[in-house]
Amino acid sequence: LGWATKDKEFVVETDEVKLATDTVLYAQYKKNEKTTSYQKDVTVNEDWDVDPNDLDSYTLLDENVALEEPEAKIAWFKTKAVGENYLAIDDAAGRGLYKAMWNYYHDGKNVNKGIKFSINTGDGLGLFNVYTCFTEDHPELSWMRGCGVDMAAGSNGRTYCYMHPSYDYNASEVIRNFNTVENSDRYQNLLKKVKKGKTTADTLDNIARVICANLAYTEDKDKKGNYSSKYRDAAYVINQSEKHECVCVGYAYTFKMMCNYFGIDCVNVGGDAEGGHEWNYVKVGKKYYGVDLTWMDSGSKQQNVYCYLEDAKTFGVKGYDKSNLRKSDLYIEKYITLATTPYKRNVTVGKFKYQITGGGECTLTGATAKGKKVTNLTINKGVIYNGLTYSISKIGDKAFKNNTYLKKINITAVKKIKTFTVGKNAFEGCKNIRTITLNNSFGKKINFCNKSFRLGNKKKCRVSIISSKKLKKDTVKKLKKAGLKKFTTN
């Protein structure tokens, strides 16, 4: 509706409010206001006439447009000028427009105002592609959605263009969102919860954990099928929604903004995943890994890290996997180096060492100095690292070889994993083990690699197998093959 003082003495019905006094103005809007469109549509009007006396104000586009440095006085706008989607623009005029848009709009400048530019007549310019690339790279400019472009040919061999916001959505929503960006401390409070880790991956863990603990997934349409764009708008999700409710776009945009805040390259990708979807690729080392935080929303009893720091094949990128689970509209995959395997890292949790292997799983690789003196080893629940839970799907090769402190082993093949594996020589030489419990009640197979249970025990150990008769028989056979000689079963 416009702007008003706190006691609503007067309302300014305009979206162009200039600072004149110390009076604080508050955005006024209708309750349950609906948005008719969120699409980043670009409409072109070629019946427009350019003012011949105003030609000098139109920036001539080419790839050499100089970029301004970001000021980033407000945390919300702390991002880099050129994002990864810029690489998907293959024409000089398009790259020039991208840079000109950054110069005009960065740090929250010129909210809801149009930009003037010109191109040499005959030069190609993919307006929709440029606008989409720019808005995907800069979700902090949340008020930028659809736009209209007025075009007119000049007598000097140039085509003059005026690109302005589209009003298919409610203009007061733009005012409201920008006002909350400048005055809300909710984003800053979320950032304070994110600790910068020792490594890039540790920082990403903390970002993902904070986002998924505070954002909640919701549907973006009502029972009548009417869509509301607010759940796709980062400014609304963070600064206005009490429960931080959003759809996939909200997760992807917030993740990118926080990554950029900590200096981590991240791209959000819009496309298809059996329906419209949005996800991220984030750079760790020299490669980009797939992240889909929608799977980890705070409504889940346990955060699912299946789609976190994954390889391109898992994400169904065309050329790696025929299923095409996620297909990008802009095919940014052609321009950045995607990882073909999940991101793996070695971590220590408590008394044991693990390798996170992808798909929400990890391998128990060994013990710390204190862990080597543990007498009872139980593997059932997951491992929590940086607030994210990973299922143990394997005991690594030689993980406990020649450990004479171990007396009891209890392994449960949890429901989440397909197969549990005990690696080569994992317990070889653990001659003092007296009790082994293998819980296979979910019907998951437990595989034993060569010499994994070659204990070298002089006394018989007792093996308790919790499973179906068929699996129990199979497990006993595999244990013998794995080197276990002296044992009795329940």
Segments (PLM) and residue ranges:
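Surface-exposed interfaces of beta-sheet-rich extracellular modules
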Residues: 1-15, 397
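Conserved "repeat-terminator" motif of extracellular CCP/Sushi domains
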Residues: 12-34, 162-168, 430, 452-453
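Intrinsically disordered, low-complexity N-terminal segments that are enriched in acidic
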Residues: 37-164
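Secondary-structure boundary elements
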Residues: 173-240
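Hydrophobic/aromatic-rich core segments of domains that either
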Residues: 249-315
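Structural signature of tandem-repeat unit edges
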Residues: 291, 351, 357-360, 371-394, ...
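Low-complexity, Gly/Ser/Thr/Pro-rich intrinsically disordered linker/tail segments
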Residues: 300-345
